[in-house]
């Protein structure tokens, strides 16, 4: 239904689908992976009752900034994507969208996002510049370091402190446990993503944690996921979350165990499916948080 709605945009403009693909609106999993942790933080900051205003700001902001991140990522990789089987049909790699068009779209998306942030408070506005810097520099990190996934983890976690400051005007130390947990989790699932492209990346000189970890990749991934769950458990103690939250963590742990088992072959398509599967873990944790606060009321 959602995909058919997007495809119908071609009737309005013949190039609409190129820009939809550039923003990855046709592939919402990345948006979910950014959205669920942001909502964890928003729900906890609001003690289960986030304002409608902040829900709108952060849900819309996640969609816009994820789209902006995809645009700048494709600009950065436009000369590499054509050499990677999974990405060679992307709009910029295939020459269907120019660099100027991409930067114009990026500016529009960032401008709309900043307009939303201006509806919050000064502290959140200041924090938003960090989010922009991380989103803009992440795509270029894979040329210089084997840890681009860490930068992505920081980018995908930056909305969490912003959620606290927007909802409460303050940033408690405990909020950084959520930040660290999500950063660790992001490094883990994006390593699965990088494992799917590892052979091509080695040929063209792109760096990633998948290449760095080598044959220890799956063990390190499951260790990172375990540490993420431990940080969430500590955060749950500090924020006085109960059994529903713990059930969400158990379900997430089950998701991680399934991914570890399924990726024994390390086949690219299997690793990519493991990456996609992570959004269910994030959703399970969110459901646990929501239900925990709802049953306390």
UniProtKB/Swiss-Prot annotation:
Reaction(s) catalysed (UniProt annotation): all-trans-octaprenyl diphosphate + 4-hydroxybenzoate = 4-hydroxy-3-(all-trans-octaprenyl)benzoate + diphosphate
One Gene Ontology cellular component annotation held by this UniProt entry: plasma membrane
Root EC class: transferase
CDD domains tied to this protein: PT_UbiA_COQ2
EC code(s) of this entry: 2.5.1.39
One record GO biological process: ubiquinone biosynthetic process
Cofactor: Mg(2+)
Subcellular location: Cell inner membrane
Pathway(s) per entry: Cofactor biosynthesis; ubiquinone biosynthesis
Membrane-crossing residue ranges in chain numbering: 29-49, 55-75, 102-122, 124-141, 146-166, 169-189, 219-239, 241-261, 270-290
UniProt-listed InterPro entries: HB_polyprenyltransferase-like, Prenyltransferase, UbiA_prenyltransferase, UbiA_prenylTrfase_CS, UbiA_sf
GO molecular function, one term: 4-hydroxybenzoate polyprenyltransferase activity
Keyword match Ion transport: no
Keyword annotations: Cell inner membrane, Cell membrane, Magnesium, Membrane, Transferase, Transmembrane, Transmembrane helix, Ubiquinone biosynthesis
Main subcellular location of this protein, as a coarse class: membrane
One Pfam family cited in the UniProt record for this chain: UbiA
Bilayer topology: Multi-pass membrane protein
Coiled-coil ranges (or none): none
Membership in a protein family: Belongs to the UbiA prenyltransferase family.
Known function: Catalyzes the prenylation of para-hydroxybenzoate (PHB) with an all-trans polyprenyl group. Mediates the second step in the final reaction sequence of ubiquinone-8 (UQ-8) biosynthesis, which is the condensation of the polyisoprenoid side chain with PHB, generating the first membrane-bound Q intermediate 3-octaprenyl-4-hydroxybenzoate.
Protein name in UniProt: 4-hydroxybenzoate octaprenyltransferase
């Amino acid at each position: 239904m959602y995909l058919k709605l997007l495809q119908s945009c071609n009737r309005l403009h013949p190039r609409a689908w190129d820009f939809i693909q550039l923003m990855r609106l046709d592939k919402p999993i990345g948006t979910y992976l950014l959205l669920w942790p942001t909502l964890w933080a928003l729900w906890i900051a609001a003690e289960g009752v986030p304002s409608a205003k902040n829900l709108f700001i952060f849900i819309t902001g996640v969609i816009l900034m994820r789209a902006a991140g995809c645009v700048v990522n494709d600009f950065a990789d436009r000369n590499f994507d054509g050499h990677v089987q999974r990405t060679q049909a992307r709009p910029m790699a295939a020459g269907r969208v120019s660099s100027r068009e991409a930067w114009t779209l990026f500016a529009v998306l960032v401008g709309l996002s900043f307009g939303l942030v201006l509806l919050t408070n000064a502290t959140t506005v200041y924090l938003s510049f960090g989010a922009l810097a991380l989103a803009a520099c992440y795509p270029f990190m894979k040329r210089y370091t084997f840890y681009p996934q860490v930068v992505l983890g920081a980018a995908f976690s930056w909305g969490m402190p912003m959620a606290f400051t927007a909802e409460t005007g303050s940033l408690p130390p405990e909020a950084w446990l959520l930040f660290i947990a999500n950063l660790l989790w992001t490094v883990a699932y994006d390593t699965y993503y990088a494992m799917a492209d590892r052979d091509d990346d080695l040929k063209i000189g792109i760096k990633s944690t998948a290449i760095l970890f080598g044959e220890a990749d799956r063990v390190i991934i499951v260790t990172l996921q375990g540490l993420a769950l431990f940080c969430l458990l500590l955060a749950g103690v500090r924020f006085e979350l109960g059994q529903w939250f713990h059930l969400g963590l158990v379900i997430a742990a089950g998701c991680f165990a399934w991914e570890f088992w399924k990726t024994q072959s390390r086949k690219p398509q299997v690793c990519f499916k493991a990456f996609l599967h992570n959004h269910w873990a994030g959703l399970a944790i969110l459901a646990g948080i929501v239900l925990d606060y709802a049953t306390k009321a």
